[in-house]
């Protein structure tokens, strides 16, 4: 893991009659990752960069393909959440058109894979993750749940065994609910295949809000930030904050939003390298909006 840079999300918006309103921009921050060659490992040691193996990112015995797939799903889920939060805050029309429950991680070899879409559990259609939990909780340890899934556009059934973990009945998967919305105005944000993960949630929410309202919250400033976003607007902790601050400084960002949980390390990085930028800690989306409206 090494210093990264910024991604101008303002330029990624796809929307009819889109008005940027400003010469400034809203940017996500990223960290750089390099394959572990002798040269890159030597550079990491000289620069005191963090070195991690794929095993440190694995849940159970996942493949690299599953890790990458999970990060892509998390990115798309983050956009789902950002859209709901931004439209709700802006008072714009948004209704849920379709839901799907997607496996993003597995802790056991239970027949399910990252990316599987859960169509039903024991012949019962499940609206969300809570419905799946209810079916599991109504069974006993060592019972099985029959999942009908969609994998690679093909339907199939898998049987997953129930076991106890911290006194809770589980089948060893993490599932998120993805949404397809009816929204007005319609908007989308385009990503590159290499861009993944949930840490851009706050900045996606700000970008969508700026696009669908008449307000100009950017005001010709180059603004960056990081942090996950939850449906209640909470901004969550991320990894690699020092490298994101280094990347922001390299790209001449003047305002950086960070989650409160990452604030202390962000300030330490700023002070260590004497960066000329303002670090703003936020607990939720509204705090970021209020700061930009000052």
Please place each PLM-identified region on the residue numbering.
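Terminal peptide-recognition signature
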Residues: 87, 115-118, 147, 173, ...
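PDZ domains, with a preference for the canonical peptide-binding region formed by the helix
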Residues: 120-148, 263-266, 270-271
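Glycine- and Gly-Pro-enriched alpha-helical subdomains that act as flexible
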Residues: 211, 223, 231-264
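C-terminal, low-ordered peptide segments at domain boundaries
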Residues: 152-207
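Second-shell loop/turn segments in exported
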Residues: 33, 65-77, 104-105, 120-123, ...
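PDZ-domain C-terminal substructure recognizer with occasional recognition of PDZ-binding tails
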Residues: 134-175, 273-287, 291-294
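Extended, small/polar residue-biased N-terminal targeting/export presequences
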Residues: 3, 7-98
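PDZ/PDZ-like domain segments forming the peptide/carboxylate-binding groove
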Residues: 77, 81-129, 234-239, 260
């Amino acid at each position: 893991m090494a210093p990264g840079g910024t991604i101008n999300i303002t330029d990624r918006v796809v929307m009819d009659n889109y008005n940027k309103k400003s010469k400034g921009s809203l940017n996500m921050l990223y960290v750089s990752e390099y394959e572990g060659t002798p040269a890159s490992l030597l550079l990491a040691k000289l620069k005191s960069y963090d070195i991690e193996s794929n095993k440190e990112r694995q849940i159970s015995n996942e493949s690299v393909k599953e890790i990458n797939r999970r990060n892509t799903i998390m990115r798309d889920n983050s956009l789902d959440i950002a859209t709901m939060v931004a439209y709700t805050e802006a008072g714009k029309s948004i209704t849920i058109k379709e839901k799907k429950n997607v496996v993003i991680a597995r802790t056991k070899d239970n027949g399910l894979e990252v990316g599987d879409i859960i169509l039903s559990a024991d012949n019962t259609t499940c609206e969300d993750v809570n419905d799946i939990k209810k079916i599991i909780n109504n069974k006993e340890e060592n019972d099985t749940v029959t999942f009908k899934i969609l994998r690679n556009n093909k339907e199939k059934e898998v049987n997953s065994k129930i076991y106890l973990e911290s006194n809770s009945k589980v089948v060893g998967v993490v599932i998120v609910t993805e949404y397809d919305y009816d929204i007005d105005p319609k908007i989308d944000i385009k990503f590159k295949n290499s861009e993944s993960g949930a840490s851009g949630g706050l900045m996606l929410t700000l970008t969508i809000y700026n696009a669908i309202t008449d307000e100009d919250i950017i005001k010709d400033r180059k603004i960056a930030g990081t942090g996950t976003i939850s449906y209640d607007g909470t901004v969550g902790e991320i990894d690699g904050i020092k490298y994101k601050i280094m990347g922001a400084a390299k790209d001449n960002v003047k305002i950086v939003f960070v989650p409160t949980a990452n604030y202390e390390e962000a300030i330490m990085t700023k002070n260590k390298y004497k960066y000329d930028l303002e670090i703003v800690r936020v607990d939720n989306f509204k705090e970021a909006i209020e700061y930009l409206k000052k």
